[in-house]
Amino acid sequence: MCARRFLFLIFFLTLIMVAGAFAVYQFGASTLTRMATPQGRYEPPSPRSGPDYKLASSWLARPGIADNPAAWVPDGVVTTIATSPAATFYIHPTTYLDRDRWNAALDPGGDAGFRARLFVQSQASAFNAVSDIWAPRYRQAAFGAFLLKSEDATKALDLAYRDVRAAFDAFLAAQPAGTPVILAGHSQGALHLSRLLIDRRAALKGRLVAAYVVGWPLSVSADLPATGLPPCNAPDQTGCVLSWQSFAEPANPSLVLDSWVGSRSASGVERKRDDMLCTNPLNGARDGDATPDTNLGTLVPNGDLASATIAVGQVGARCEDGFLIVNGRIPPLGPYVLPGNNYHVYDYALFWGSIRADVERRLAAFRA
């Protein structure tokens, strides 16, 4: 990786950590807003500019794509491809930082495209032992769209979601009848996934192994009822939702809480402080506690971030007040943990091996 990309990636991850999720609204008048908010008003794209998800070029990962980033595994991990795989639909987080538009191009290329592949490689790969992985390109809302509660920002997020929904419909249409479905997303991707669970509730009935809605807060009583799905309370439960947000001690999630508590779900229900969903990915239980020896592998990136090794049995975690608090011997993951000890960027990497085992276990239970 060239030095320019490396430095730009640090800048990107730093912004995501400081301003990710609901926390970014706290910086409305700050330098961050001036630096990142898209210039001008939102302008709807031409109807003909939308993606065609019948084309392989509209996907970052799907069966048959050469140099598929979702097929990656860290050194020392052996993957046995399932003879009758499930299908995973994965939605990547924000990777577009420029201010020239409210939504990225379908294939933004350059650093934004590189970062999207990096997230598919490090996150979606956790599901590749049991499933084909489909990861769409989509006209993601630019990072700055999260900095404002404005009509323009809402329109940008809605456009991104419409692409995701269209991609999901194409994904589902391509699956043989009865194929088990796994859903996963992170940050902006998790936000879109939370909407998809509502809009495609009927299509998912009887087919969903689990939904991994990671790095975006969910209320059990305000958000989940509209999906018709329960939280995953046990490691072999299926047709349920997992969600977590990772912090280390001393944790200070006030930036997330200040904007989330009291906000309302799509159905108008107020979100309450004591109702945030936390699943422990180490044991698959809601509000669970797990010691470091139960962690089947943390991804530790190499110097240029192009690959990673697995560190087993080093990081434990417990759910506390709706957040996942990590402990143990956290390996050096990079300089991206910022104020509040928020490990947002590492929500998947910290537990990669255990997420891999979790989905294998739930799929086995689904097929039993």
Each predicted region: which residue ranges?
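Loop/turn elements at helix/coil->beta-strand transitions in domains of secreted/extracellular proteins
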Residues: 84-86, 129-133, 177-180, 206-210
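Gly/Ala-rich beta-loop-alpha elbow adjacent to hydrolase catalytic centers
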Residues: 183-193
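Active-site catalytic motif of lipid deacylating hydrolases and related acyltransferases
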Residues: 27-48, 53, 91-179, 327-368
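Short extracytoplasmic
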Residues: 42-71
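Structural recognition of the beta-strand scaffold that forms the well-ordered cores
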Residues: 87-90, 134-137, 182, 210-213, ...
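Hydrophobic membrane-insertion alpha-helices, especially the h-region
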Residues: 7-24
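Surface cap/lid and interfacial helix-loop subdomains adjacent to catalytic sites
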Residues: 2-9, 37, 165-177, 198-336, ...
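Extracytoplasmic/periplasmic/luminal assembly and interaction segments
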Residues: 60-98
